[in-house]
Design a protein with these regions (language model features):
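Catalytic machinery of carbohydrate-active enzymes
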Residues: 1-253
Length: 253
């Protein structure tokens, strides 16, 4: 469908990947890599840009280093919110329990709760902030309900603008997230982070940062790219223990 629109609009140069009955709709094309051998997504689309400049297929460097600026107004807004609840910036761990895609990208809430408890027990000055959209608020409440010392953990899911979420992540000591948009924000901000993968492929959508630690079990059934576990066990996420994630966090310091 996406290839049909530029054809109907009489756009002269229509670049894309072959397949899906696109013959004639695109006039500059590449073979679509198989799902079992996909390059990182950024490289996947940069290859089309390269094709426009080098239709003869010259291979050029497509390595990228994403960067993101923090809005001064958002930074001030978040600082004010943190001061209101007496949270010091140097002690913030941001945990992002959500993933819009579905449960096969979400590390279990009980694991997030256990990790939060470990951080609080091991670091008395630690403050945990749960971050996400409005749809993640219930996940945040589930996590908090399983944690003692709830004065050190707050649910900000659905309570920030996108700019404020970016600013908060930029202030964090460590970011722990699923494979989600907030993970990529953390990577672009070069924040120390742990990225947890389940049904998706960290080779295809990795956090592009040298400060990121990826945890992926690489089970025979993974990546399945399904919204629900076809086998009904969700071992790709459930078998990632909180202690494993805690160990990854400790290597970031």
């Amino acid at each position: 469908k996406s290839a049909l629109i530029p054809w109907l609009a009489n756009i002269p140069l229509r670049i894309g990947y072959r397949g899906e009955m696109r013959f004639g709709l695109i006039n500059l094309s590449l073979d679509n890599p198989s799902k079992t051998n996909r390059p990182p997504m950024v490289n996947h689309y940069l290859a089309l840009c390269d094709l426009m400049e080098h239709p003869e297929g010259i291979e050029i460097n497509t390595s990228v280093d994403p960067k993101l600026n923090i809005s001064p107004a958002a930074k001030q807004s978040v600082s004010t919110k943190l001061q209101a609840v007496a949270i010091e910036k140097k002690s913030i761990y941001v945990l992002c329990p959500g993933a819009e895609y579905g449960v096969t990208k979400r590390w279990p809430t009980e694991h997030f709760a256990s990790l939060a408890q470990h951080l609080i027990n091991n670091e008395p000055n630690a403050n945990i902030i749960l971050l996400g959209g409005k749809g993640d608020h219930a996940l945040g409440e589930e996590i908090i309900s399983q944690v003692k010392n709830t004065a050190q953990i707050q649910n900000w899911c659905g309570e920030t603008s996108l700019d404020e979420a970016i600013a908060l992540i930029g202030m964090s000591k460590v970011l722990v997230s699923n494979d989600s948009g907030l993970m990529h924000i953390g990577a672009a901000l070069k924040v120390p982070q742990v990225a947890i993968f389940g049904s998706s492929d960290p080779h295809h959508t990795p956090p592009l940062s040298d400060k990121a630690k990826v945890i992926w079990l690489n089970l025979p059934c993974s990546p399945c790219h399904k919204r629900e576990c076809p086998l009904g066990h969700l071992k790709c996420l459930k078998d990632i223990s909180p202690s494993t994630v805690l160990g990854a966090i400790q290597t970031l310091h």
